[in-house]
C-alpha cells in the first residue's frame, strides 16, 4: 500500500511537469561541462566567480589534505575543531565586519540551527514570502508564530510588527533572492527591527563574495556596519562565490556564543573537513584581492551584455543587478520546452518550477559566472532568439 501510494503521487508529479531528475556531470564544475556524454555551456551554476575549479584553490586543497587529512572525525565541540576552522572563523568575522563568526557545514544547516536557537513558542518570526526554503523550514522547526509578508512590502511588515505581542521578534530575509535576483531593502528592514525591538537575520547566500567592496557582501553594499548593530545576524555561504563548501553566521560576540551553545545543527554533527576550511582561507584572499575585483568586474560586463541583448525581445528579465537573471515563462511545460530547445543548441539553462517558485511563475534561471566570456553570452542570446 505504501509503495502504491508513492507510485501514484510520483505519477501525478510527472503529469504536472514537476518531477525532477538529476544530471550527472563527468567534468569539474565550470562553464564548459560534459553531462551524460554531451558537451554543454552551463548557465546554471552558482559558481559566480569561477573559483570552484580554480588551480590556486586546488593546490591549497592538496596542501591542506596533506597537512590536515580529509576528515574531522568528530563534532566541533568534541574533537573536530581544528586550527583551520578557528582561523577561518576569525577571518570571516573580520571580512564581513562582525565581532565573531561560526562556521557551519552548509547554509541550509546554518539557517536550520540559528532560527530555533533564537526563537520558540511565544515568539514571532516575520519572513519575506520569497525567502529560501531553508528559512521556511527553520521557522517551522522553531515553533514560533510564522508571519509572512508580501515580497519586499515594508508597509505590511510594519503592520505585522506593530500588532505583535510576541515576547521576542525576528525579521528574516534573503539579501539577494535566489530565484529573482533582486535585493532586500536591508536599510529599511534594519530600521524596522530597531523600532520594534526585533532581531534581523539576513541570508546573503547569493551576495557574499559578489556585492560590496572586495565582495564583502550585501550589508557592506548598503553601508551597514555589522558590528554596530547587536540585533543583526549575517549568514553567508561558502560554496557559491567562494567556490568551496560550507557557510557561516556572523554577529555580536554574545549571539555567536549562544549559537555555539544552542544551535543543534552545529553541535550535533561532524565538523566539516579542516581541509575545506584551509582552502577557504585561500579563497577569501582571492575574493578580497585584485583577482576578485577583476572577476567581479567581468561579471558586471556579462550582466550588462545579457540585459542589453534582451531589450525589446520576447524574453523579459526580472529586474536584477546580480548574477541571477530570471525569465518568467509561466506554465511548467512551456518552461521545460524552452529549456529543452536551449539544450538542443548545447546550452544548459534550467527550468525552475514550483515548489521552488510560486505556481504560474515557472522560469528560466540564468546564472552568470566570471568564467563566462562575452561570446558565451552572445551565444545564449542567439539561442534564446531562435527559441522564440
Curated annotation (Swiss-Prot):
Q: What is an example of a Pfam family matching this protein? A: Aminotran_1_2
User: What quaternary structure, including any partners, is listed in this protein's UniProt entry?
Assistant: Homodimer.
Question: What species was this sequence derived from?
Answer: Herminiimonas arsenicoxydans
Catalysed reaction, written as an equation: 6-carboxyhexanoyl-[ACP] + L-alanine + H(+) = (8S)-8-amino-7-oxononanoate + holo-[ACP] + CO2
- Function comment: Catalyzes the decarboxylative condensation of pimeloyl-[acyl-carrier protein] and L-alanine to produce 8-amino-7-oxononanoate (AON), [acyl-carrier protein], and carbon dioxide.
Q: What is its EC number?
A: 2.3.1.47
Query: Mind telling me which NCBIfam families this protein's record contains?
Result: bioF
Name of the protein:
8-amino-7-oxononanoate synthase
For the ligand (pyridoxal 5'-phosphate), the binding residues are 107-108, 178, 206, 237
Essential cofactor(s): pyridoxal 5'-phosphate
The UniProt record gives the binding positions of substrate as 20, 132, 356
Where does this protein have coiled-coil stretches? none
Sequence similarity: Belongs to the class-II pyridoxal-phosphate-dependent aminotransferase family. BioF subfamily.
GO molecular function annotations of the record: 8-amino-7-oxononanoate synthase activity; pyridoxal phosphate binding
Amino acid at each position: 500500500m505504501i509503495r502504491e501510494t508513492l507510485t501514484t503521487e510520483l505519477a501525478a508529479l510527472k503529469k504536472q511537469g514537476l518531477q525532477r531528475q538529476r544530471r550527472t556531470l563527468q567534468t569539474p564544475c565550470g562553464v564548459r561541462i560534459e553531462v551524460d556524454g554531451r558537451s554543454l555551456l552551463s548557465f546554471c551554476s552558482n559558481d559566480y566567480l569561477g573559483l570552484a575549479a580554480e588551480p590556486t584553490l586546488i593546490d591549497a586543497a592538496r596542501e591542506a589534505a596533506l597537512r590536515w587529512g580529509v576528515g574531522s572525525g568528530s563534532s566541533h565541540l568534541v574533537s573536530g575543531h581544528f586550527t583551520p576552522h578557528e582561523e577561518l572563523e576569525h577571518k570571516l568575522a573580520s571580512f564581513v565586519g562582525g565581532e565573531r563568526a561560526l562556521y557551519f557545514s552548509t547554509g541550509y544547516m546554518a539557517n536550520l540551527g540559528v532560527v530555533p536557537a533564537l526563537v520558540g513558542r511565544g515568539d514571532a518570526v516575520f519572513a519575506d514570502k520569497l525567502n529560501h526554503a531553508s528559512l521556511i523550514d527553520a521557522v517551522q522547526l522553531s515553533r514560533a508564530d510564522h508571519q509572512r509578508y508580501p515580497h519586499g512590502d515594508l508597509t505590511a511588515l510594519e503592520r505585522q510588527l506593530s500588532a505583535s505581542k510576541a515576547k521576542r521578534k525576528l525579521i528574516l530575509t534573503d539579501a539577494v533572492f535566489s530565484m529573482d535576483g533582486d535585493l532586500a531593502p536591508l536599510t529599511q528592514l534594519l530600521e524596522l527591527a530597531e523600532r520594534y525591538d526585533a532581531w534581523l537575520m539576513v541570508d546573503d547566500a547569493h551576495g557574499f563574495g559578489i556585492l560590496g567592496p572586495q565582495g564583502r557582501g550585501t550589508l557592506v553594499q548598503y553601508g551597514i556596519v555589522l558590528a554596530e548593530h547587536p540585533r543583526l545576524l549575517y549568514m553567508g555561504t561558502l560554496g557559491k562565490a567562494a567556490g568551496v563548501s560550507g557557510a557561516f553566521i556572523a554577529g555580536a560576540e554574545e549571539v555567536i556564543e549562544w549559537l555555539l551553545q544552542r544551535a543543534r545543527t552545529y553541535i550535533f554533527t561532524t565538523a566539516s573537513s579542516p581541509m575545506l576550511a584551509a582552502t577557504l582561507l585561500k579563497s577569501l584572499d582571492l575574493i578580497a584581492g585584485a583577482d576578485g575585483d577583476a572577476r567581479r568586474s567581468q561579471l558586471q560586463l556579462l550582466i550588462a551584455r545579457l540585459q542589453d541583448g534582451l531589450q525589446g525581445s520576447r524574453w523579459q528579465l526580472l529586474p536584477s543587478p546580480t548574477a541571477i537573471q530570471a525569465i518568467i515563462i509561466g506554465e511548467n511545460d512551456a518552461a521545460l520546452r524552452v529549456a529543452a530547445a536551449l539544450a538542443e543548441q548545447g546550452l544548459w539553462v534550467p527550468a525552475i518550477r514550483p515548489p521552488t517558485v510560486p505556481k504560474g511563475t515557472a522560469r528560466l534561471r540564468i546564472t552568470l559566472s566570471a568564467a563566462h566570456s562575452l561570446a558565451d553570452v552572445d551565444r545564449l542570446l542567439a539561442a534564446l532568439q531562435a527559441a522564440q
